[in-house]
Amino acid sequence: MARVKTLTILVSANGYGHIRRQILIARELLRRFSDFRITFALTDKQYQRFKLDIEALGEMADVVAGVTEDSVRWRHNPENYTDANLNGWETEWKSHAKLANSDFVISDNLVGVLEKRPDAVLSGSFLWHEVIAAYSDRNEACKRFVDREISLLRQNVPKMICNQSLASRAVIGLTSPVEVSWMIDDIIQQQTLALRRSILVHGGGTRTLDCKVLEIARKLRQANFKVFTDLEDDQDCFDYRDETWRTIGVVVCRPGAGTATECVKWKIPMVVLRDAENSEAEFIAERLTLLGLAHGLAGDLDSDQLVDLAKDAMAIEKMQKYIAPFENCRRNGVVETTDFLENYWKLSELAK
């Protein structure tokens, strides 16, 4: 009987797209291999948000919560970055022998893993040094972080699973990219266009655009639209349930990879809420605009102009035009990723 193989999945603290895609990959791995134990290393908040999804994976999946609390995330104030909140997670992770010494490691956007585990497979469509570099001349901790991440990547040239539609220049240039299509789970039934009458205004989970989100939501509500936001204290905080996604006709958002993936899944056009200081957000917005999936990138649109764009996308007679580009999106990324891991780690041979 084959020995149970262990996999640790480390997940960046920034937003929910990271953990959502890793749950899909874990589910497909466990579907193929019964002798596989997967442990997620998450923040407490990620665990609470996705507890039921992880439990649904069965007894071969578990969680160590709190490990990645002190991992890099987007902050508008460069003075708020320290060595501790950029790299502190590494000490916590290394203290858990079960995590650090597992047979395999996937790290979603946390490059520091390569120091202990140069064999780790990275996952994500951008690298954190691309974003933090904007603050390198104002904060020594940021400069050290950027220099170290680039050095680790050049030394190890790791495999990195990335969305072929969104992969950044640094991912392509500094890693050995494994380009896959959109990571969409089971094919779901789409709602009739005429019934998709709600709007989601979403700041991307980083909390840096909350005031803008609230302003746009207020104006859309004044125009009698049903509006959800990602603000926890809002009267209509979005619950991310399938039945709620089915009601959404347009998403006004700072388009991170996670939000973009959900919009591709549900075929929901996006109106871009810009975050000009964040190079990742701007790059993704450009890519989505080129693909015809997002609108409003040109110029620096004010909230009234963004509201008008959202209204236009919600017009019944125009909805099909906005949705048409989504038909060109390939959605097999979960299977493609698992195929790669199965071959790269020789899992079929190990199972014999």
Where do the language-model regions lie?
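Short internal beta-strands
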Residues: 38-45, 161-163, 226-230
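Conserved nucleotide-sugar phosphate-binding/catalytic loop shared by glycosyltransferases and other
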Residues: 4, 11-13, 36-85
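Conserved nucleotide-sugar donor-binding subdomain of glycosyltransferases
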Residues: 71-113
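Donor nucleotide-activated moiety binding/catalytic core segment of transferases
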Residues: 228-265
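C-terminal amphipathic helix plus adjacent low-complexity
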Residues: 309-352
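Catalytic binding pocket for nucleotide-activated donors in carbohydrate/polymer assembly enzymes
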Residues: 259-308
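A nucleotide-sugar donor-handling region in carbohydrate enzymes
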Residues: 124, 129-197, 203-206
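Conserved catalytic-core segment of nucleotide-activated headgroup transferases in glycan assembly
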Residues: 21, 25-28, 184-233
